[in-house]
Amino acid sequence: MTLANKLTLSRIVMVPVVIAVYYLPFSFSGVLAAVLFVIASLTDLLDGAIARKRGEVTSFGKFADPIADKLLVAAMLLPLCGDGKIHAAIVFAIIAREFIVSGIRLVAVSSKTNSVISASWLGKIKTVIQIVAITVILLGNWPFSLINFPMDQILIWLMLTITIWSGADYLIKYWGIIGETK
């Protein structure tokens, strides 16, 4: 197994750790969860860079990397929703998009072309915005709360917008593959 794939798997392993820390009964659990969430998110940058630098880009990595991102993001959206920090309809829309895009990827792999769909530039921007938004929410909108600026709310709406946009982009680009399954 390549180092890049190990980093991807480590991101998946960190998901329950970040959630457990978020629920710890002390005042700085959100901050600690944010730190762990950022560390887990940074493995997303590292795994791709390492795979490309070493010439170790694999089909597993192309498929597992976006799944690891989705797990990390969805796993944090749910408790934030449960705590009333993000509206349930927004979380539903984001998670629904992730299932739809994952479904498109599965169909592409099982199609006649046996295609592995890598993350698009728009999908990568979406992931970065989701990570930034979740981090700011975990930090209680700090440092923006010091100047009474609702950055968390702005990021939530930006996250929803880019998520829907990138989902529509995948649907438009890969709609033809859906009819080509074996």
Located regions from the model:
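Alpha-helical transmembrane bundles and membrane-interface segments of multipass inner-membrane proteins
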Residues: 1-182
